[in-house]
Amino acid sequence: MKIIDFDELYSDKPHIVLVLGYFDVFHLGHKLLLEYAKKEAEKLNAIFAVFTFSNDISSYTDKTEPIYNFEKRKKLFALLGVQLLITAKMDQSFKSMSASEFSAKLKEKYNIKEIVVGMDFKFGKNRESDFNVLREEGFVVEVMSLLKDKHDNIINTTDIKKLIKSGNIKEVNEQLTFTYSVSIRNCIEGSNGEILADIDTNLKNGNYICALECYDKHSSEFPCTIKDSKVLFKKSVLGGIIANNKLDDAELYILREVNRKEKNS
């Protein structure tokens, strides 16, 4: 996957099928967008591209802090087959850019075969414009329907963040493209054979079943305790998969809450 800055100029203006979105978490609705765009790019002999922001945009929009940082999002975009990632930094200048200005920049830089967005897509100054403006500007635009969960509610990032905060990790994972995970850092080995580490999450304090991935090695499932953005688990669960307990590059997958049987075992 190639990563470029939105301000870069290209002499060859590559032909692309472009998905527009922030993607601070990859839920099933996002997966639908990306899979459709990938197939369209293959059909049109074009590059499968995504435009997104590389920084936390919560200071400039009504969005809350992202679930996944940019480093993790880059990895997930690559796993989904994105060939070209076009990134911009949200700032006051970009926030003030009109929809027409943004559209003109897209036309200037790329040969866009098709743009793919969700039904709820908004852009431009104060997010006042939608996909109809893109069509008025001459783009071919595919608007994807919004997916619903088992409760007949539209799957969206805001509700997923609420589910994380409430500890309903089962429903979180049902709505995500990838199992919910957090990066581990600042690991400390305790005297009783336990590992304590920091994690970036506002997941409800509690006991969960987790798994670790580090340097392409995977652990078995194990119980852990999450409290105040820290995780505690027994060192023995590593089973020798991680040399020298270097866990600062590890990913902790949070699979489900501990059930009654697991609590008593």
Regions found by a protein language model. Name each.
Residues 2-4, 85-88, 142-144:
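General small-molecule cofactor/ligand-binding pocket signal
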Residues 72-86:
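A glycine-rich helix N-cap at a beta->alpha junction
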Residues 182, 188-265:
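Phosphate/ribose-recognition catalytic cores of enzymes acting on nucleotide-derived substrates
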